[in-house]
Amino acid sequence: MSVFSRLRNGIPPSRDDCQSPYERLSQRMLDISGDRGVLKDIIREGAGDPVTPDASVLVKYSGYLEHMDKPFDSNCFRKTPRLMKLGEDITLWGMELGLLSMRRGELARFLFKPTYAYGTLGCPPLIPPNATVLFEIELIDFLDSAESDKFCALSAEQQEQFPLQKVLKVAATEREFGNYLFRQNRFCDAKVRYKRALLLLHRRLAICEEQHLVEPAELLVLLNLSFVYLKLDRPAMALRYGEQALLIDKRNAKALFRCGQACLLLTEYEQARDFLVRAQKEQPCNHDINNELKKLSSHYRDYVDREREMCHRMFAPCGSGSSVGGN
């Protein structure tokens, strides 16, 4: 059903009603700008805290001109919308104000007057002058990066002055960013975030009384780094971080599995088998581990067959016409 069909269904116009669809809709909307330049109608309530200034948001949106059923702008066709930072990636003032009023999971409809949208000139040929536009926005999630960005900009000496809980919070935020970028297949960017988190945690490991509090967070980041290096086709680095994770928890099934995967890619079959069998011992019913062991068995059989064929050729008796220099 189109936007304007919904408007008509929501507010049936009377015979003498000469108002436009946007004017009718605006009568039931909440003024969030103070001058009725940005109006809001909540379609589905969200939960938790509202978006914070300087946050990075994950949203789906569609923008409509009045009397038009098809959006002039939308990111709903994307499988995974990109993360956008307030104040940098979002250019519409109205959208920024609207997002600051939203909570996770919320779906809302907004009307933006020209001052909060495309101005008096519009954006030819797509947006006419003095256009009021309607946006439907769904806030999927947001990450508050302001605190993390400010903290990471400090020197190591300055960071050491903060309590451990602050460091753990910033490291967790960096890891969350990395996880989001990983889900978008932006593996190099994810790696940078994970390494930032690891650096913050390593600086606190020097304080002995904090080690037992830092290591659980460090373990998660090391597992992330091992996985992202597998995705980047760098198994040696994946093995390195996986082994560091095992120094914290030698029975961690995920770390053992990552090390096994890395060794298989490095064609270190005996090592791969050792890691994977240990992982299977921890999680006997894990399908990924069991499938990787089957994959290892297949690769090893192929390897043995190739070695046998090579040896056969090396030591096969020479034929009568195979001498060097023969015609």
UniProtKB/Swiss-Prot annotation:
SMART domains: TPR
Main location: cytoplasm
UniProt GO MF annotations: Hsp90 protein binding; identical protein binding
GO biological process, one term: meiotic cell cycle
One cellular component term from this protein's GO annotations in UniProt: cytoplasm
All residue ranges annotated as the PPIase FKBP-type domain in the record: 54-143
Region (Disordered) location: 1-20
Key words of the record: Chromosome, Cytoplasm, Differentiation, Meiosis, Nucleus, Repeat, RNA-mediated gene silencing, Spermatogenesis, TPR repeat
Entry's localization field: Cytoplasm, Cytosol; Nucleus; Chromosome
Record-annotated disulphide pairs: none
Domain of life of the organism encoding this protein: Eukaryota
One Pfam family hit: FKBP_C
Transmembrane annotation, as ranges: none
TPR repeat residues: 171-204, 219-252, 253-286
Family: Belongs to the FKBP6 family.
Function: Co-chaperone required during spermatogenesis to repress transposable elements and prevent their mobilization, which is essential for the germline integrity. Acts via the piRNA metabolic process, which mediates the repression of transposable elements during meiosis by forming complexes composed of piRNAs and Piwi proteins and govern the methylation and subsequent repression of transposons. Acts as a co-chaperone via its interaction with HSP90 and is required for the piRNA amplification process, the secondary piRNA biogenesis.
Subunit structure, as described in the record: Interacts with HSP72/HSPA2 and CLTC. Interacts with GAPDH; leading to inhibit GAPDH catalytic activity. Interacts (via TPR repeats) with HSP90.
Matches recorded under PANTHER family: INACTIVE PEPTIDYL-PROLYL CIS-TRANS ISOMERASE FKBP6 (PTHR46674:SF1)
Disease connection: Defects in Fkbp6 are the cause of spontaneous male sterile mutant 'As'. Males are sterile and aspermic due to abnormal pairing and misalignments between homologous chromosomes, non-homologous partner switches, and autosynapsis of X chromosome cores in meiotic spermatocytes.
Name under which the protein is recorded: Inactive peptidyl-prolyl cis-trans isomerase FKBP6
Organism per entry: Rattus norvegicus (Rat)
